[in-house]
Amino acid sequence: MAIRQLPEMLINQIAAGEVVERPASVVKELVENALDAGATRVDIELEEGGVRLIRIRDNGGGIAPDELPLAVSRHATSKIASLDDLETVATLGFRGEALPSIASVSRFTLTSRRHDAEHGSALEIDGGRLGEVVPRAHAPGTTVEVRELFFNVPARRKFLRAERTELGHIEEWLRSLALARPDVELRVSHNGKPSRRYKPGDLYSDARLGETLGEDFARQALRVDHSGAGLRLHGWVAQPHYSRASTDQQYLYVNGRSVRDRSVAHAVKMAYGDVLFHGRQPAYVLFLELDPARVDVNVHPAKHEVRFREARLIHDFVYRTLQDALAHTRAGATPNSIGSDGAGYTGATAGEMGNIASGGPANHGNAPGRSGSAYSYANWTPSQTPLGLRVDEARAAYSALYAPPPRNAPQSTGMPSMAGTGLPATSEDSGVPPLGYAIAQLHGIYILAENAEGLIVVDMHAAHERIVYERLKNAHDSIGLHAQPLLVPMTLAVGEREADTAEREADTLATLGFEITRAGPQSLHVRSIPALLANAEPEALLRDVLGDLREHGQSCRIASARDELLSTMACHGAVRANRRLTVPEMNALLRDMEATERSGQCNHGRPTWARFTLSDIDRWFLRGR
């Protein structure tokens, strides 16, 4: 078959296949153009989910009459002029493909007026056929009207979903935009009826956050704002008990652009680590700011993805920032105590605990089977399988934590004391500690405590398990990770890419306890392994580490395996169900919870405590009605 030059209309329709997937894609491209033009108000009118009509009206800078035909020409743009501009682009659009692509598959009208012009001008395009520029009355700004999307491409139109589905995609993208640009007023109408209005406000406005993601997220979100190495990460991360079954509340913006990035998503998941219940997803709204020259935005047709020039640095920065924010959450903090450093934790309410429980079974440390409650224990089996790990080195740290007290010391349960923590033992307002004072033990499982707000219920095994676990981790962090030399080096057959990674990352592997040299194109000599994990299938572990280093630039496999061992030890060392505690022992546990990082969840991600305010209890008994 002979090679031929494709006609311009067909070229535009091919480009439309990449840029215009559905009505939401059209709305995205047109609204981004409005924002790049400096608009502070954008009106979006839709009919039949955007298939019949999409009309975008803005108050931006407008387009001159003689530039209207150029605006709908391929690769015509006002945003870049050279390769240097492309490498440092800061606008949302830059390719000049959107308008001609949309115009080629719809009945398209572009009307615009510059602020210094006496009247506006309009240009109509019908399925790619260009009309004449004509004068038209119009307010300063631009209106783009897209009718009968895909009317001339029946195969594409056939794949569009139901009206409600297409409208849902548009609304989801507008939520994402509303979070990124709270300074812009957005008005949306569908089939002639107003459906949504986002009022302009401050970036950190609780009102904008609440109306986009819901009041629950706004109440449970931790503010994050950290800068370093020419990077800034700010926004909100939901507390661990506010988790989701899906990734529907994960928003990442790079220099104001909504994107998806596997490396950043991996860093976030790592940061949540052992505070997120199995199978649940974190919720967050994060803004990453950096020099535009350090990120390539020209890697995806719809600009949904970016490529970082220093991916490892970005991954580490995001991970450490969020890990620090989540580490400072402690049991007993009220919503008012949550600051920009992430310190503070509001605890799970009864409804939230039930929501977490619906994602999987819960472990209450030998608790008897129950039915008819939010949790079901009868058929529960531990989610952590026994590990073939060497525990001798961990025993020393474990024993040190639980050494018998001196003869003249008061008796305790072996729970670490709060002495020397430097943390306030009481709340500033009432003089009562955040978790209050113990008043009773329920069925040998729960501690009931009274604080200034009402009733606190604590799962004593889960809470003590977290306390022991954090103490064990801190003890091992102070010791460091030791390498165990092998009497006979182990030869490991790997792929060439894995061997290249091992050679390139030799220093990183050494910090993890592996001493590795290259034996051949597809083989490695392993001369030492992490001592604590000597019996944990080092070959499989090393392969996983190499895979992580190749894909993400770093690996948490060693730390995860170590933490899994310490978590198992903490679970076995924690106070068990049906253990009767005295009131002083229960109070000691409450004080330790207030002083321990991540004490809002046990090692498996379950909540350790819940709060029932006095007003909640009054409502149960219809008091005040």
UniProtKB/Swiss-Prot annotation:
GO terms for molecular function: ATP binding; ATP hydrolysis activity; ATP-dependent DNA damage sensor activity; mismatched DNA binding. Signal peptide: none annotated. InterPro entries: DNA_mismatch_repair_CS, DNA_mismatch_repair_MutL, DNA_mismatch_S5_2-like, HATPase_C_sf, MutL/Mlh/PMS, MutL/Mlh/Pms-like, MutL_C, MutL_C_dimsub. GO terms for cellular component: mismatch repair complex. Residues 404-427 are annotated as: Disordered. Keywords: DNA damage, DNA repair. The keyword Transmembrane helix does not apply. One of its GO terms (biological process) is mismatch repair. SUPFAM superfamilies: ATPase domain of HSP90 chaperone/DNA topoisomerase II/histidine kinase, DNA mismatch repair protein MutL, Ribosomal protein S5 domain 2-like. CDD domains: HATPase_MutL-MLH-PMS-like, MutL_Trans_MutL. HAMAP family: DNA_mis_repair. PANTHER family: DNA MISMATCH REPAIR PROTEIN MLH, PMS, MUTL, DNA MISMATCH REPAIR PROTEIN MLH1. This protein is involved in the repair of mismatches in DNA. It is required for dam-dependent methyl-directed DNA mismatch repair. May act as a 'molecular matchmaker', a protein that promotes the formation of a stable complex between two or more DNA-binding proteins in an ATP-dependent manner without itself being part of a final effector complex. Belongs to the DNA mismatch repair MutL/HexB family. This is DNA mismatch repair protein MutL. It comes from Xanthomonas oryzae pv. oryzae (strain KACC10331 / KXO85).
